[in-house]
Amino acid sequence: MPDDCSILLINGAQKDITKDELKMIKTYMKNGGKMYVFLDARVENLTNLYSLLQSYNVEPQKGVVVESDASKYTQYPIYLLPTIESSDATSAQYNNNVYVLAPSAKGLKDITEKNAKKDSSASDYTVTSLLSTSDGAYSKVDTSSSTLNKEKKDISGPFDISVAVSDSSGGRMIVTGCTNMLLQDIDQAVSGANTDFVLNGVNYLAEQKSKISIRAKSLKTENAVVPAFNQKATLIMTVFVLSLIHIS
């Protein structure tokens, strides 16, 4: 691990970290290190990486999150519009009428209570939700299934899609269960709000006092993000009004 490493980035690991790398990362974090982890929902069997996250009270769930609340997704139930929670890392976007878009995301669970039953040091780590689903969300374990309907082996929510973890030694970590957020077309769909979310997370990790906030946008027309519920309601109203006009 370089001595001048300000923030360690693990971006959509396709294979597991080694045991030696696991030890190095743990030492780095115990010395006040900062880490940003993006998880690819399609990749499982990351035993050492998941072990690291679980030791920080964050448990990645198998599969891809499916949202049942039509106000929390757009186009498809796996195109999530998660709730932006109140936190130091999200203060610029919280309650600011902003959507972030997280397609094909992996759910995260706060397992602080579970870990505390086995290890009293679990309380040294504080998990804060940054992005969350509705209570009706579930994780589709079989990602090759022909249906998005909830099946017996699927995992019930709610889930966090992104969390921040701080520890008593000064270490900080953000774990986000989506690698697609910064794809250009996905980010543009929410007028750069995904980039703002990530940059504010970096700002939080770096413990900068000045907020990155919401970056200035160009004069181009911004995309209007419409949750699926609103899309359906608009369609119903349009059909109803047009029907009345036709009848009259």
Each predicted region: which residue ranges?
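C-terminal target-recognition/interaction regions appended to catalytic cores
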Residues: 240-241
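Acidic, S/T/G-rich, low-cysteine, solvent-exposed domains in lumenal/extracellular/periplasmic regions
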Residues: 1-210
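Conserved small/polar residues in nucleotide/adenosyl-binding loops
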Residues: 245-247
